[in-house]
């Protein structure tokens, strides 16, 4: 049996340099290779004309450049494109491309499903199968960039921002998320500014501390409730890492980070008559008073079987005005791609659930309804 080839998309620059050294080659060859892969979108070693023929033969024998394939895509009326990405064994994750006048953002998945059980999120209802590998994470960026079109003459890439806000909790897959983000930031990789790469978390505090020690990228935090009682229901990881502990981790991250410019983005999904009252707005403002932040209010995006509804524009407006009375910066997120189920909280993919989440959910639906009313 032939030896399995090394997928070079699984290696950041440090890993590639180590591989080239082990092959008896100069480490700078790794830099050349990365430029071909990430600047020009080349996956065929024989097209890399500044790499000598002997080294190309070695690479062909031992290595490969393989990104997961796009199974299908849907385009929204607003230009948003949702991609189904095949990660093997009949499973798919979803990746969303959001073009705007001054930027093009890609929302990337980190897991097949999600191990957390946020009750308003479609991904969470599908259960969890496994973590994505480095090549499956960075491969989403590479594959979509290839679909939209690398400008091979200049090395210009069609993606300016990446947000780790797709399927999964990124901080539960740090082993692979950190090297993937390293490649996004690397000058020989996708060469994105650290302020243009954002990782989102629901509050896995020990992993947040580890991330802060390893990497400096923008941070978005999923709060969604102004107190522990409600957050225990909406974001059950709160039972393990309650709000005060989470806020402490956020403040420690901000203290280490330059990418956040001294403040963090707070994500708060607006659920009709659940977390959107003016009293809850006052409570949220007081909760966040010692944490430098801007607050992103996200109108809830319904999905089939969801127990929640979207807050009305008038309730969102009142909630926003209360927060601004406290001097907080507030943004109401514009919904993108909801007509193709590509908006925040709607990603589902195709998952072989290892947690039996769907069966358990059916038993719990009525209990959740009683708890939140």
From Swiss-Prot:
The active site is at 94 (proton acceptor), 344 (s-methylcysteine intermediate). Keywords: 4Fe-4S, Cytoplasm, Disulfide bond, Iron, Iron-sulfur, Metal-binding, Methyltransferase, rRNA processing, S-adenosyl-L-methionine, Transferase, tRNA processing. S-adenosyl-L-methionine binds at residues 168-169, 200, 222-224, 301. It comes from the Bacteria. One of its GO terms (cellular component) is cytoplasm. Reaction proceeds by a ping-pong mechanism involving intermediate methylation of a conserved cysteine residue. Specifically methylates position 2 of adenine 2503 in 23S rRNA and position 2 of adenine 37 in tRNAs. m2A2503 modification seems to play a crucial role in the proofreading step occurring at the peptidyl transferase center and thus would serve to optimize ribosomal fidelity. This is Dual-specificity RNA methyltransferase RlmN. The gene is rlmN.
């Amino acid at each position: 049996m032939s030896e399995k080839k090394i997928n070079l998309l699984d290696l950041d620059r440090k890993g590639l340099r180590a591989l080239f050294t082990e092959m008896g080659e100069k480490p700078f060859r790794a830099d050349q290779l990365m430029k071909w892969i990430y600047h020009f979108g080349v996956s065929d070693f024989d097209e890399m004309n500044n790499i000598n023929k002997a080294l190309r033969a070695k690479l062909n024998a031992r290595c490969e450049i393989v990104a997961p394939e796009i199974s299908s895509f849907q385009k929204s009326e607003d230009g948003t494109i949702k991609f189904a990405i095949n990660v093997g064994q009949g499973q798919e994750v979803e990746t969303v491309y959001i073009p705007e006048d001054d930027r093009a953002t890609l929302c990337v998945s980190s897991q097949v499903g999600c191990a957390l059980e946020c009750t308003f999120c479609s991904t969470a209802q599908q259960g969890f199968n496994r973590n994505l590998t480095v090549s499956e994470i960075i491969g989403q960026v590479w594959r979509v960039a290839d679909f939209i079109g690398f400008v091979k003459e200049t090395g210009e890439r069609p993606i300016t921002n990446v947000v780790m806000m797709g399927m999964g909790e990124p901080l539960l897959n740090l082993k692979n998320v950190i090297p993937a983000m390293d490649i996004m930031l690397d000058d020989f990789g996708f060469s994105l500014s650290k302020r243009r790469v954002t990782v989102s978390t629901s509050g896995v505090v020990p992993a947040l501390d580890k991330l802060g020690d390893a990497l400096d990228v923008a941070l978005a935090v999923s709060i969604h409730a102004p107190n522990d009682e409600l957050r225990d229901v909406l974001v059950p990881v709160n039972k393990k890492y309650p709000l005060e502990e989470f806020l402490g981790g956020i403040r420690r991250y901000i203290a280490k980070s330059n990418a956040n410019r001294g403040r963090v983005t707070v994500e708060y999904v607006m659920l009709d008559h659940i977390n959107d009252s003016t009293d809850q707005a006052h409570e949220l403002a007081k909760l966040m008073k010692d944490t430098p932040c801007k607050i992103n209010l996200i109108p809830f995006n319904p999905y089939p079987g969801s127990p929640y509804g979207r807050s009305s524009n008038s309730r969102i407006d009142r909630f926003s005005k209360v927060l601004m009375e406290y001097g907080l910066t507030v943004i109401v997120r514009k919904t993108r791609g909801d007509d193709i189920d590509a908006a925040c909280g709607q990603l589902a993919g195709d998952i072989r659930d290892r947690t039996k989440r769907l069966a358990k959910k059916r038993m719990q639906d009525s209990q959740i309804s009683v708890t939140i009313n």
